[in-house]
Amino acid sequence: MELKQDQIVNFLKNYGFVYQSSEIYNGLANSWDYGPLGALLKNNIKQLLLKHFVFSQPDMKLLDSSIILNPLVWQASGHLDNFSDPLVDCKKCKSRYRADKLIEELNDDSIKITENTDPSYLEQILVDKKVECKKCESTNWTKIRKFNLMFKTFQGVVEDSLNTIYLRPETAQGIFINFKNIVRTQRMKLPFGVAQIGKAFRNEITPGNFIFRTREFEQFEIEYFLEPELVKEKFDWYINQIEDFLINKLLINKQLIKRHEIAKDELAHYSSRTIDFQFNFPHGWSELWGLAHRGNFDLTAHSNESGKTLDYHNEIEKTKIIPDVIEPSLGIERILYAIFCAHYHVEQLADNDSREVLRLPVSLSPYQLAILPLVNKLKDQAYQLYLDLLKISDANLRFDFDSAGSIGKRYRRYDAIGAKYCLTYDFDSLEKGIVTIRERDSMEQIKIPISELRQWIRNNLHE
């Protein structure tokens, strides 16, 4: 069955993964809050990314840079001049669109659009192809104008151009401007990488497709610094690592993932090569994870703007270079959405029954194990077992407790939210010290002594 966006959105809202932000005030467009389950799942994703790409690598460091940076950072990086979208308005109903996206939806292979495409060319296509407004079907468009995507605000009490600052549209620049600090304080030698997870903000003209494109989001970015002659080998290494992570760590079906090499004439101004790893979302194939060779564009640009030399000094060979950079870049909300789409299933059972199942790998499950008393009179004893297990809980191992409703309905709820196992505390538990463990995907059950429960947890709930 083909998964519809409305279906997955309703599921996530109903179970408390995602809420409409400011809902009691009728919400705020394109703004979402992550409920208790969504917050846990997002944290699991981030921990898994750090474990795989940072903490298990001998040449990686972690950074947490400021959201608000000196505006000259954005002047040097090109964001003030180039980080914009072509905005066009419908003259009839005043609806606003990205002109390039309207044209892309024509699916006309003869039309090539890049970030450097002249606005007059886009205007002519809108006229020649009689592109209609999605809301009122008018073909009467305004002139295209460039709309900068950075959120602008002011620092201090005076709102003038001297106090203008911006919320960062990416985390990468915080890494580049700290290159010298990291080399000096951490005594780094090329090649090495720096990773960062943090908030970024983009004032998108047409956000949408649920959490796929939002104005506030989290990024996981790595800037890997290296000599030019090592670029190809490391670029290929990251291709393999990203695919391995998606398929073998997140257990995403490889049929839902494909590579897309960006054509030379479509590359961003800073990139000499970019591969997008695309996922088949409900709205179609779209970018999930980007991998770019940025050359030495950023370090050179910041050297020129700041007057500080951001080079690397090889003390053994007595040489200086401005290293090249390879950048894997991922939106946390985007990979979260892909995980939901990949692992959500509606399973048909006997007697015309069905169940919703979120078949998450155990490392991603919001709760690895739920403790459920069979009947209410066993609630106190089951809750004490739950409290005992909480003593061994940590960032990667979480337990939950639920005593409300029939055991069957509780099983269904935990299947739906992705809990890998349910532990049932029944009369055998009380009289013989034996509990029943039910596995989510197969629904098979085993019985184990409570005395062996911690060993079972070590064997089955840690990856």
Curated annotation (Swiss-Prot):
Binding partners and assembly: Homodimer.
A GO CC term assigned to this protein in UniProt: cytoplasm
UniProt-listed GO biological process terms: glycyl-tRNA aminoacylation
Organism annotation: Mycoplasmoides gallisepticum (strain R(low / passage 15 / clone 2))
Task performed by this protein: Catalyzes the attachment of glycine to tRNA(Gly).
Residues annotated as signal peptide: none
GO MF entry, a single one: protein dimerization activity
Name of this protein: Glycine--tRNA ligase
Major enzyme class: ligase
SUPFAM superfamilies: Class II aaRS ABD-related, Class II aaRS and biotin synthetases
Enzyme Commission number(s) from the entry: 6.1.1.14
Keyword vocabulary terms for this entry: Aminoacyl-tRNA synthetase, ATP-binding, Cytoplasm, Ligase, Nucleotide-binding, Protein biosynthesis
Catalytic activity as recorded in UniProt: tRNA(Gly) + glycine + ATP = glycyl-tRNA(Gly) + AMP + diphosphate
Sequence positions that bind substrate: 98, 170, 217-221, 327-331
PROSITE patterns the record matches: AA_TRNA_LIGASE_II (PS50862)
Family statement drawn from the similarity comment of this UniProt entry: Belongs to the class-II aminoacyl-tRNA synthetase family.
Coiled-coil regions listed: none
